[in-house]
UniProtKB/Swiss-Prot annotation:
Major localisation: membrane
Gene field: psiE
Organism in which the protein naturally occurs: Bacillus velezensis (strain DSM 23117 / BGSC 10A6 / LMG 26770 / FZB42) (Bacillus amyloliquefaciens subsp. plantarum)
Membrane topology: Multi-pass membrane protein
Subcellular location(s) per record: Cell membrane
Protein name as it appears in the record: Protein PsiE homolog
Transmembrane residue ranges: 14-34, 56-76, 84-104, 109-129
């Protein structure tokens, strides 16, 4: 009987551990976001004096910035929505990641095509999730 009572506490302890880990992850991601912001500011400053070879690097870093931002927003949403990750945020992050991949590595047309199909699939999934949520709300 005593083991049973301790076992019932396990989900609460694991939830607390998860919350603490996500909090520290958000702090680490915030540091990385600040680092990316500094890199972008330096890049813009260098571009004013034409010391930049390629703007693709800047675009890639900008998309990494948005990915950090989206992960932080996901963690904030997790805490605000009673410890639940909304699926649409994962879809946003997936679309951003694939767009970054296409921008950085677009040498082979067939690969770009398949990555674009992956984005289309995620957009369809996003539409289905939003439609399901709007039907459930009404």
């Amino acid at each position: 009987m005593r083991f049973s009572n301790n076992f019932k506490k396990a989900p609460y302890l694991l939830q607390a551990l998860l919350n603490v880990c996500l909090f520290f992850l958000a702090i680490a991601l915030s540091g990385l976001l600040i680092s990316e912001t500094w890199y972008i500011v330096q890049f813009v400053y260098k571009s004013l004096f034409n010391k930049v070879d390629s703007y693709y690097e800047m675009l890639g870093e900008l998309l990494i910035f948005f990915m950090y931002f989206e992960f932080i927003a996901l963690i904030i949403k997790y805490f605000k929505s009673d410890f639940h990750f909304p699926l649409r945020y994962f879809i946003y992050i997936g679309i951003t990641a694939v767009i970054r991949l296409i921008i950085i590595d677009h040498d082979q047309a067939i690969s770009t095509f398949w990555w674009a199909m992956a984005i289309l699939a995620m957009i369809c999934a996003f539409f289905i999730v939003n439609r399901r949520n709007s039907v459930v709300e009404h």
